[in-house]
Amino acid sequence: MLVSARVEKQKRVAYQGKATVLALGKALPSNVVSQENLVEEYLREIKCDNLSIKDKLQHLCKSTTVKTRYTVMSRETLHKYPELATEGSPTIKQRLEIANDAVVQMAYEASLVCIKEWGRAVEDITHLVYVSSSEFRLPGGDLYLSAQLGLSNEVQRVMLYFLGCYGGLSGLRVAKDIAENNPGSRVLLTTSETTVLGFRPPNKARPYNLVGAALFGDGAAALIIGADPTESESPFMELHCAMQQFLPQTQGVIDGRLSEEGITFKLGRDLPQKIEDNVEEFCKKLVAKAGSGALELNDLFWAVHPGGPAILSGLETKLKLKPEKLECSRRALMDYGNVSSNTIFYIMDKVRDELEKKGTEGEEWGLGLAFGPGITFEGFLMRNL
């Protein structure tokens, strides 16, 4: 399902040589999951009648704040592959069979939306950065996407695999570096994710699988990144600077392993606290790169990958942010769930809408943040154009 995007009117001029976001598109699978109906439908399809699990899932569905998600996995998928809902079944082959095709198709659809908004020919794309934690094969989805879009066989490709929730901003950082160091280049960045690899029947020994069932969704996003926009292009965000760091000795807090049954995840209960304890210093380092000591955190617009609602609440409290500052992150979580690497761009799309409504009163500077395995912090200082 393609999601329409539109061209924004430029309000400020980008600094010479700085990478900008020239267009953004997204795509979602056709299967819509309403959180209100999830519990009964999910348990019925996987043939689970455990009342304790039902109660826990109902509680999680309310606490995640998610209202709607989109998934590749459907009733038809489970009927075709019933072993996906069978405990202990070696199903990695079937999962990859579904996921490999699905992630490229969603990336293709998001790219079409993005390229249409951009308004230039596909032949003008010089580089491709392809991000996914949901497929595994050689050659990778970057090659299949290039062929499907009709990109030049000399397009310069980069793949980023299995980064999780911070993958979108990592891809954006790589795209920024490419754009700023290759004059005239235009970089297509795509992110595409599906929960098919991690779908598991509920088990009391694996409580995190229920969190996944209540929180995660599927989808794709695509952006065109380039420096020194032409008259025909309409940049809406300048990528002023990027920063990444990991927290030492936290490798086990977010743990994912590929097995014969798919991907298994473990999430430490101390994740929100670890982020809260370290986020203020990280943000202040980024803000300092704006070259203005007068900027306060509440002077900025914010695009924060939510992970889950506890991370947003902790960050808001720690940084003393006004409630409206994280509204776009909360609405994206509500509308799509946690869509891993895509989520930051769904939020950025909502931020774009809000800044357009504010017009000249909109904030000039903002922060983009995402957190993932490592624990890795990925951040951007951005400028509203």
UniProtKB/Swiss-Prot annotation:
<feature type="binding site">
    <location>
        <begin position="56"/>
        <end position="63"/>
    </location>
    <ligand>
        <name>CoA</name>
    </ligand>
</feature>
<dbReference type="InterPro" id="IPR012328">
    <property type="entry name" value="Chalcone/stilbene_synt_C"/>
</dbReference>
<comment type="function">
    <text>Plant type III polyketide synthases (PKSs) that catalyzes the condensation of malonyl-CoA units with various CoA ester starter molecules to generate a diverse array of natural products including long-chain alkyl alpha-pyrones.</text>
</comment>
<keyword id="KW-0808">Transferase</keyword>
<keyword id="KW-0012">Acyltransferase</keyword>
<keyword id="KW-0217">Developmental protein</keyword>
<dbReference type="InterPro" id="IPR001099">
    <property type="entry name" value="Chalcone/stilbene_synt_N"/>
</dbReference>
<comment type="subunit">
    <text>Homodimer.</text>
</comment>
<feature type="binding site">
    <location>
        <position position="267"/>
    </location>
    <ligand>
        <name>CoA</name>
    </ligand>
</feature>
<feature type="binding site">
    <location>
        <begin position="307"/>
        <end position="310"/>
    </location>
    <ligand>
        <name>CoA</name>
    </ligand>
</feature>
<feature type="active site" description="Nucleophile">
    <location>
        <position position="165"/>
    </location>
</feature>
<dbReference type="Pfam" id="PF00195">
    <property type="entry name" value="Chal_sti_synt_N"/>
</dbReference>
<keyword id="KW-0284">Flavonoid biosynthesis</keyword>
<feature type="binding site">
    <location>
        <position position="310"/>
    </location>
    <ligand>
        <name>CoA</name>
    </ligand>
</feature>
<dbReference type="InterPro" id="IPR016039">
    <property type="entry name" value="Thiolase-like"/>
</dbReference>
<dbReference type="InterPro" id="IPR011141">
    <property type="entry name" value="Polyketide_synthase_type-III"/>
</dbReference>
<keyword id="KW-0256">Endoplasmic reticulum</keyword>
<comment type="similarity">
    <text>Belongs to the thiolase-like superfamily. Chalcone/stilbene synthases family.</text>
</comment>
<protein>
    <recommendedName>
        <fullName>Type III polyketide synthase C</fullName>
        <ecNumber>2.3.1.-</ecNumber>
    </recommendedName>
</protein>
<comment type="pathway">
    <text>Secondary metabolite biosynthesis; flavonoid biosynthesis.</text>
</comment>
<feature type="binding site">
    <location>
        <begin position="217"/>
        <end position="218"/>
    </location>
    <ligand>
        <name>substrate</name>
    </ligand>
</feature>
<dbReference type="Pfam" id="PF02797">
    <property type="entry name" value="Chal_sti_synt_C"/>
</dbReference>
<dbReference type="GO" id="GO:0005783">
    <property type="term" value="C:endoplasmic reticulum"/>
</dbReference>
<dbReference type="GO" id="GO:0009813">
    <property type="term" value="P:flavonoid biosynthetic process"/>
</dbReference>
<dbReference type="GO" id="GO:0016747">
    <property type="term" value="F:acyltransferase activity, transferring groups other than amino-acyl groups"/>
</dbReference>
